[in-house]
């Protein structure tokens, strides 16, 4: 959530942010009104309580008619204090509810617009010219089937659409990717973590995934637990309700977890293969830093993502995501998109978001520096979303006979194997 003091001092900035997101600008005025009621009702409650306490002392010293009048006033005060308390609680609840609906403040350098209004910042690598090489590229599903690596038919039989099995070299390729990604993260100073896949509502809400993203989340009604769509959620909530020593920052975690997404708004999109699925594994980077260090940390996370994709020998570009395409918790977001030959376009493989103090305020995570305690900043970045990375590797490193060249960085994790060969029929 944002700082209420900032809202009071510069409401136009918050309105501009909401407008850039394509969200309800009127929410800002509703929140200002609720906050004013909360503050004024709090003042009234404090005044009545002070009078009530003072009256108790006077009653002890009074007698006769004076005491009777004071007792009458005390009875009225009891009613008034109760009403003021209820009014204060109601105004506070309304303020908190509206505050939870407000997105993070969009960074002023973020391009304004929707999904297609991003700005390309960098392009890396070159697209292969398959025509010059003399063959038509196969898509990742055809290649996966030739290699005995991907089985979507049995995935659908067992679990429904957008589920799959990774078999043989497909399973080995996932394990190689995960181990290589964790090795890179560990070398960069991240602490590896295996995180829970089920979290409580306060963890999901605290990271900003129960607002605009709620329809994409799986919920277990009987247990009131949520399946995470990313280990960002448990990694952010790891220090919930804690005060961290400033000398410990930055804290960097690399979480590995299964991820679950309903893909409710994706009907008809990417129905072939494993690019968009309901369950997948992912290595996620997460950082806790001082607020003034968040932009520099954001660049570091992006550099680590670029280093990873470069090590996989993939052509990719970096985009500055437009304002209306940001998640509610992100002030700024960069995506790295790999070139997918059979689609003839770049597709998202990684993303990194600077969430500033938004999540830490919601999760009550603070930092202590001497006698000063304040919210800190949180950031996240995908290192390896496994299925999409497999898609990019298969398509970009395929050879005419249906085999796939293994990027050098993965070979130590595949027993030195240099090529994935089609299985014998």
Swiss-Prot record:
ATP binds at residues 261-263, 277, 348-351. It is found in: Cytoplasm. Keywords: Aminoacyl-tRNA synthetase, ATP-binding, Cytoplasm, Ligase, Nucleotide-binding, Protein biosynthesis. GO terms for molecular function: ATP binding; serine-tRNA ligase activity; tRNA binding. It comes from the Bacteria. Signal peptide: none annotated. Its EC number is 6.1.1.11. It catalyses: tRNA(Ser) + L-serine + ATP = L-seryl-tRNA(Ser) + AMP + diphosphate + H(+); tRNA(Sec) + L-serine + ATP = L-seryl-tRNA(Sec) + AMP + diphosphate + H(+). GO terms for biological process: selenocysteine biosynthetic process; seryl-tRNA aminoacylation. L-serine binds at residues 230-232, 284, 382. Pathway: Aminoacyl-tRNA biosynthesis; selenocysteinyl-tRNA(Sec) biosynthesis; L-seryl-tRNA(Sec) from L-serine and tRNA(Sec): step 1/1. GO terms for cellular component: cytoplasm. HAMAP family: Ser_tRNA_synth_type1. Homodimer. The tRNA molecule binds across the dimer. Catalyzes the attachment of serine to tRNA(Ser). Is also able to aminoacylate tRNA(Sec) with serine, to form the misacylated tRNA L-seryl-tRNA(Sec), which will be further converted into selenocysteinyl-tRNA(Sec). Belongs to the class-II aminoacyl-tRNA synthetase family. Type-1 seryl-tRNA synthetase subfamily. Consists of two distinct domains, a catalytic core and a N-terminal extension that is involved in tRNA binding. This is Serine--tRNA ligase. It comes from Streptomyces coelicolor (strain ATCC BAA-471 / A3(2) / M145). The lineage of its organism: Bacteria, Bacillati, Actinomycetota, Actinomycetes, Kitasatosporales.
């Amino acid at each position: 959530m944002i700082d209420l003091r900032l809202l009071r001092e510069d409401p136009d900035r918050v309105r501009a942010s909401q407008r850039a997101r394509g969200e309800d600008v009127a929410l800002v005025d509703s929140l200002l009104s609720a906050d004013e009621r909360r503050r004024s009702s709090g003042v009234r409650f404090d005044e009545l309580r002070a009078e009530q306490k003072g009256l108790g002392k006077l009653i002890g010293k009074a007698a006769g008619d004076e005491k009777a009048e004071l007792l009458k006033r005390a009875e009225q005060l009891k009613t008034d204090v109760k009403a003021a308390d209820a009014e204060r609680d109601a105004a506070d609840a309304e303020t908190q509810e509206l505050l939870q609906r407000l997105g993070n403040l969009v960074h002023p350098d973020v391009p304004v617009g929707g999904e297609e209004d991003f700005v390309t910042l960098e392009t890396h690598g070159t697209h292969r010219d398959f025509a010059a090489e003399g063959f038509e590229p196969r898509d990742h599903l055809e290649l996966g089937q030739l290699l005995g690596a991907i089985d979507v038919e049995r995935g659908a039989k067992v679990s429904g659409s957008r589920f799959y099995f990774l078999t043989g070299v497909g399973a080995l390729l996932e394990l190689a990717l995960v181990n290589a990604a964790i090795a890179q993260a560990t070398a960069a100073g991240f602490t590896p973590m295996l995180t829970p896949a089920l979290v409580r509502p306060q963890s999901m809400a605290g990271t900003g995934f129960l607002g605009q993203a709620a329809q994409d989340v799986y919920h277990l009604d009987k247990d009131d637990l949520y399946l995470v769509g990313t280990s960002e959620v448990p990694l952010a909530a790891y220090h919930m309700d804690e005060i961290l020593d400033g000398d410990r920052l930055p804290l960097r975690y690399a979480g590995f977890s299964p991820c679950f997404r309903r893909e409710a708004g994706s009907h008809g999109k990417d129905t072939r293969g494993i690019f968009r699925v309901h369950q997948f594994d992912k290595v996620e980077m997460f950082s806790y830093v001082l607020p003034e260090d968040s932009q520099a940390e954001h660049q570091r996370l992006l550099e680590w993502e670029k280093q990873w994709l470069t090590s996989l020998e993939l052509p990719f570009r970096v985009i500055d995501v437009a304002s209306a395409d940001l998640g509610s918790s992100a002030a700024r977001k960069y995506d790295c998109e790999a070139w997918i030959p059979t689609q003839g376009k770049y597709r998202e493989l990684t993303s990194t978001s600077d969430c500033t103090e938004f999540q830490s305020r919601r999760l009550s995570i603070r930092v202590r520096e001497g006698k000063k305690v304040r919210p800190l900043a949180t950031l996240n970045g995908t290192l390896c979303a496994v299925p999409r990375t497999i898609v990019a590797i298969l398509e970009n490193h395929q050879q005419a006979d249906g085999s796939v060249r293994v990027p050098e960085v993965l070979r130590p994790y595949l027993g030195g194997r240099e090529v994935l060969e089609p299985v014998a029929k």
